[in-house]
Amino acid sequence: MIKPQIWFAGTPEFATAALDALVKHVSVAGVLTQPDRPAGRGRKLKASAVKARAEHYQLPIAQPERLQESAPPFAHLPRPDIVVVVAYGLLLPQWFLDYPRLGCINIHASLLPRWRGAAPIQRAIEAGDEETGISIMQMDAGLDTGAVWLEKRLPIGEQSASQLHDALMQLGAEALIDVLPDILAQARAPIPQPSSGACYAHKLSKAEAEINWQDDAANIVRKIRAFDLFPVAYSYLDDAPVRFYDGIALSEHTESAPAGTVIEHNQEGIDIVCGSGILRIKRLQLAGKNVVSAAALANGCHLKGRHFARKNQL
């Protein structure tokens, strides 16, 4: 049997598990990843997580700023049978989608057609979805509109975006290895996505992470869980930003204090009045400080009676 020519295109940590799986179970002829980007306070160039992993495996690497038909990557290699794409982050033009013999397939972190787009993990949590999953999709010219080869489901429960990211990263790698033999053998066809049920996971912004204390406590908890990687839910205390990393919603309350008021701060957490219900914060980060538990903070910085507010309400 002739060994298939497989290229891999990906950039962040989420893509590394799929690359690991391909190297372990099949082989990878070349890796595409984004160019090194400035990072950190010193703004020094930093390689992507996928580049670091590809270097570990001593795989050929290409880092084009954009894909040009006049200068295809890995021109010295045979044309690929398939390209596996995972969070690559660059636009794939039609000529590149058609370049591999069997086209390009994508690992997408949602149950398509729900949550097409840039932030499916976060939007699923924010919306209160009970489950999400992985879709292995045949790429076409649309935004995550291609036919689906395989989907695997995963309950969300109380997972944060960081926890769900790691779980879906591994599930995606498993799904890829499960379905890849069928795709390479052309043993069956992918299933077109349903015409109904599509929604879009728009890119995250820092502005939307600011907490509105008039909101329901359960909604705020979902926002905290959804944004724990980026942009991180936040509010203001005496004009200083405070980030929230973990919290739970408590039942309805009879407090007359305004929304945003801290009514209790003890070893259990920081209880804050919301438009409906009480938000109990478990972990947070004061301006210029490290992330700490609310219990640890209670020993040196008691917040009972203080008031959180939106920037435009100070």
Curated annotation (Swiss-Prot):
Top-level lineage group: Bacteria
Enzyme Commission numbers on file: 2.1.2.9
UniProt keyword terms in alphabetical order: Protein biosynthesis, Transferase
InterPro entries hit by this protein: Fmt, Formyl_trans_C, Formyl_transf_N, Formyl_transf_N_sf, Formyl_transferase-like_C_sf, Met-tRNA-FMT_C, Met-tRNA-FMT_N
EC primary class: transferase
Gene Ontology MF: a single term: methionyl-tRNA formyltransferase activity
UniProt catalytic activity: L-methionyl-tRNA(fMet) + (6R)-10-formyltetrahydrofolate = N-formyl-L-methionyl-tRNA(fMet) + (6S)-5,6,7,8-tetrahydrofolate + H(+)
Keyword Ion transport: no
GO CC field: cytosol
Amino acids binding (6S)-5,6,7,8-tetrahydrofolate: S110, L111, L112, P113
Role played: Attaches a formyl group to the free amino group of methionyl-tRNA(fMet). The formyl group appears to play a dual role in the initiator identity of N-formylmethionyl-tRNA by promoting its recognition by IF2 and preventing the misappropriation of this tRNA by the elongation apparatus.
NCBIfam families: fmt
Family: Belongs to the Fmt family.
PANTHER family: METHIONYL-TRNA FORMYLTRANSFERASE (PTHR11138), METHIONYL-TRNA FORMYLTRANSFERASE, MITOCHONDRIAL (PTHR11138:SF5)
The name this protein goes by in its record: Methionyl-tRNA formyltransferase
